[in-house]
Regions:
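C-terminal functional modules
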Residues: 114, 260-318
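A bilobed periplasmic-binding-protein/Venus flytrap-type ligand-binding module shared by bacterial periplasmic
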Residues: 119-129, 235-248, 271-272
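Short, polar/charged alpha-helical segment
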Residues: 44-63, 169
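Short helix-initiation/N-cap motifs at beta->coil->alpha
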Residues: 41-44, 62-77, 179-191
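Short, well-ordered beta-strand elements
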Residues: 32-45, 62-67, 148-152, 256
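A conserved helix-loop-strand patch within extracytoplasmic ligand-binding domains
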Residues: 106-155
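Pocket-flanking alpha-helical
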Residues: 50, 70-105, 191, 211-217
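Ligand-binding pocket segment of bilobal, Venus flytrap-like solute-binding proteins
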Residues: 83-87, 156-225
Length: 318
C-alpha cells in the first residue's frame, strides 16, 4: 500500500471513529477516565500546546498529567496503555514509529492540530525580496557565492540533517560543492541572528511553527526536488490518541479532535515561551483569553464531566 493510500485510510478510520463519537453526543460526558496523560517531548511548541489543553480540561473536571518523554518512547507508551494522547505527531519525520503503532491497532489519528506546518531551505525575507524564491536557484554560481556555499542545519545525525547531506552528496540544486554546517539548534539560530543583524545572505534549515518565523521573518524556499519531503516540505502535525482511550472517553476525544491551531498562532506562543523565556502556564492562559473564537471551536459540543456547559466553565477559570 502506498503512503497516499495509507494516509487516506488512516484519515477515514479516524473520521469514522469521531463521527461515531459525535452521534453519541448525549452520552459525551460519561467518560470512563478523569485523567488525560499527555506525551510531551522537550519541544517548545508541544510544551505550550499541552499546557493549553491542560488548562482547557481542568475546569471540566479532568486532571492533565504531562509526561516528559521523547516522541519515540511516546509511541511505545501509547501502545502499552501508559500514555493517552500526543499532540506532536510530526509526519513524515516520525513515519516509522507512527506506522508501527497504526499497524498494531493501538492508536487513533485525529488529524492535524496545526495547519500550515512546513520545513525546508529557509532564508530571511530580504533574500526573498531580492528574488530568491526556490532552492533551484542555489545552483546559480553567483547566488551560491552570496550564500558562501554554506547551508546551516541542526544536530548531526538528525533526520533533516541527513536529508541535507544526501542532497549535497547527490548534487541536488548544485549543492555538491557546498558545505553542510551541522550544529545544535541554538547554534544554527545564533548564525541566523548574526546574519540578519547585518542583512547578510544565509540559507539554513527552517521550519514552521517556530519562533524563528516571526523573529527573523523567515521564509521557506520552494523545494521541487523534495529534499525535505514531498509537497515542498509540508508536514502533518497529528493529534494521536491511544485507541482504547478514545473509545472509552468520547467527550475528551471530541475536544482532542477539535483542538486545532494555525502555524502562525503556534509560532507566536513558541516565541513567547522559548525566546522570551516566559512561564508556560502564563503563556497558555493568556493565549486562551486572547482567542475566544478558538476556545469556542475547541469546546463545541463538549461538556464538563458532570454534564454542564464546558465553555462557561473554562471562561470562568481564565
Amino acid at each position: 500500500m502506498d503512503t497516499k493510500t495509507r494516509s487516506t485510510l488512516t484519515l477515514i478510520n479516524g473520521l469514522t471513529l469521531i463521527t461515531g463519537l459525535a452521534l453519541a453526543a448525549p452520552a459525551l460526558a460519561a467518560d470512563r477516565d478523569d485523567r488525560l496523560r499527555l506525551v510531551v517531548p522537550p519541544w517548545p511548541g508541544v510544551t505550550v500546546k499541552s499546557e493549553i489543553l491542560a488548562q482547557l480540561i481542568t475546569p471540566l473536571g479532568y486532571t492533565a498529567e504531562q509526561q516528559q518523554l521523547s516522541s519515540t518512547v511516546g509511541y511505545s507508551t501509547l501502545q502499552s496503555g501508559d500514555s493517552d494522547a500526543f499532540l506532536a505527531g510530526w509526519l513524515p519525520a516520525q513515519q516509522e514509529s507512527y506506522d508501527a503503532a497504526m499497524a498494531a491497532g493501538a492508536i487513533v489519528d485525529l488529524g492535524n492540530n496545526v495547519t500550515g506546518a512546513r520545513m525546508g531551505f529557509a532564508v530571511p525575507s530580504y533574500v526573498v525580496e531580492a528574488g530568491i524564491t526556490s532552492a533551484e536557484q542555489l545552483a546559480d554560481p553567483e547566488i551560491a557565492e552570496r550564500f558562501d556555499r554554506t547551508v546551516y542545519s541542526i544536530e548531526s545525525g538528525s533526520t533533516v540533517t541527513d536529508m541535507l547531506d544526501a542532497a549535497i552528496e547527490s548534487d541536488t540544486y548544485g549543492l555538491g560543492d557546498w558545505d553542510g554546517m551541522a550544529s545544535s539548534t541554538p547554534g544554527m539560530l545564533a548564525e541566523v541572528k548574526a546574519a540578519v543583524a547585518e542583512e547578510q545572505w544565509i540559507v539554513f534549515y527552517g521550519w514552521t511553527p517556530h519562533w524563528m518565523v516571526p523573529e527573523y521573518d523567515t521564509r521557506i524556499l520552494d523545494d521541487p526536488a523534495g529534499v525535505y519531503g514531498p509537497d515542498n516540505g509540508r508536514s502533518d502535525v497529528k493529534t494521536i490518541v491511544a485507541k482504547p482511550y478514545a473509545e472509552a472517553n468520547p467527550n475528551l476525544a471530541r475536544l482532542l479532535d477539535q483542538f486545532e491551531l494555525t502555524a502562525a498562532q503556534q509560532s507566536d506562543f513558541i516565541r513567547e515561551y522559548s525566546l522570551e523565556e516566559r512561564d508556560v502556564e502564563a503563556v497558555a492562559r493568556e493565549w486562551l483569553a486572547a482567542h475566544p473564537e478558538r476556545l469556542a471551536a475547541f469546546l463545541e459540543g463538549v461538556e464538563t464531566r458532570d454534564g454542564k456547559n464546558a465553555q462557561a466553565a473554562v471562561e470562568a477559570s481564565l
